[in-house]
């Protein structure tokens, strides 16, 4: 069964692309009785406030008609930022050679948090260089991952 994020991705992807943006990812978080639905959008040259407003209006209209969310919710639309979360293997592929931090669902070697240079991706396996050593992580075990920006 698809998650709410996957259902929303399928429902909203083409509409966001029609507005000239890429739907980078979706996060749904419960806070009390409300659900926060957070859409991250990106585009060549960066996202403007107007882009976020346009996407928010379009997505709100779609969600009002399709009604895929049973709970009360707040919609947020923003850029993924410099420390952007990575949602898909294609996104990881774009950041090979970059430093990332990964949080796992199930610990590997008694650790849930790994930070290192993303070396390569083969099938559903990511190889990080952590303290000079290769560490292989399974994509399906990743709960969350973010780019560590360079300044």
Swiss-Prot record:
Record's keyword terms, sorted: Cytoplasm, Ribosome biogenesis
Pfam families: DUF150_C (PF17384), RimP_N (PF02576)
GO CC terms, sorted: cytosol
Coarse class of the protein's main subcellular location: cytoplasm
Protein's UniProt keywords contain Signal: no
Cytoplasm as UniProt keyword: yes
Localization per record: Cytoplasm
GO biological process entries: ribosomal small subunit assembly; translation
NCBIfam families the record matches: PRK00092.1-1
Function according to Swiss-Prot or TrEMBL: Required for maturation of 30S ribosomal subunits.
Family: Belongs to the RimP family.
Name of protein: Ribosome maturation factor RimP
Source organism per UniProt: Pasteurella multocida (strain Pm70)
